[in-house]
Amino acid sequence: MIRSTRARRAAIVLAASALVLSACGGDSDDEPDASDSPSASETKAATKGDGVLRIGSLLPQTGDLAFLGPPEFAGVDLAIQEINDAGGVLGKPVEEFDADSGDGTPDIAGSEVDKLFNDKVDAIIGAAASGVSVSVIDKITGAGVVQFSPANTAAGFDTYDDNGLYFRTAPSDRLQGQVLGNLAVEDGFSNVAIMARQDFYGEGLADQVKATLEEKGATVADFVLYSADAQNYTAEVNQVAASKPDAIVLIAFEETTKIIPQLIAKGVGPEDVQLYFVDGNLADYSDESFDLTGVKGTVPVPAEIDEAFNERLLEVDPKLKDFSYSAQSYDAVMIIALAAIAAGDDSGEAIGAHIIDVTREGTQCSTFEECKTLLEDGEDIDYEGASGPTDMNDTGSPASGTIGIQEYKGNKYTQIDAVSGVVN
């Protein structure tokens, strides 16, 4: 079932407002004259929030994506700090509650969501892993709470029935898959093997890479999916090696540290075959004995590198070494806060009904204080964030995005190029 479009959301909100107004009408038989009735502009729909915007974070402190946690938490912390420095939301400071998303095994995320519910959060930032998010999306959105991920890229979220309460600031893997497939072909490779996690994230991205490679005339030497819970990857690595690829796309998480040595042992490691990583396994591997020099990878990045923004993040967390998804986390919080102001209500349903509106088709603004002033003056806004344009399509995902192309020298990577595009 495809999620509600913007028009349907508006209809739902109007219907709900009508029910609220009729329920509050009392038992009087006297109908007021039209001339005595206040106009729509003179009245406000009843609010459901308690006046305090509470935001929870469900981000990785442990698990396969723990390396992404620090920049994401820093983005959330910085946004809330700046919002509160500018007067908060609806006249009160935003409250923050942190939780651990884990990696889905065991089910850490579910119990952590319960803790956030006990904290009475109106919105949750997270999770980072698409597989974790899909495991809790029904629980969160079913409770009338906004779920807003800074890092989910699985294409499946675009058609997920989420009560109009799931959003993200990272572009769908339809874009990353296209960029990665094009990159391999442009690099001169025509017989590419794909090895990917068999989960909500891995399969979707692998399918998009495969489609792009074939569209560009390349052959997919083999398409190998492996269990995310596997203890070893011998059979899958043997299968990939047997296909004799000239390049390998490895769509993985932390298990990359186990797979690379096996690829090397079979003669298809980084020194023998061109390897490509993705956002899930682009990390600092300085503690590993293998050498990744020449390996390339893709990851959603801000439209432009903003050193001033990174400096502000370092003030929040001086230990930061990586800024992946920090801007997207920051923007997720900002958009939620601005949507609450636009709604005049901090409840999840009210925020969800206004999130898309504050990202497009209004007066452009880029700071919370500037955007807040415009909203309080009755203007529609188009928030331009730290990650770039945040314009959302009707599914609650970015309508466009930028994918950074990274390359390893030793076991650390640097950005060598970036490709921006519309998410089709």
Language model features by range: what are they?
Residues I2-A16, G25-N424:
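Extracytosolic ligand-binding ectodomains
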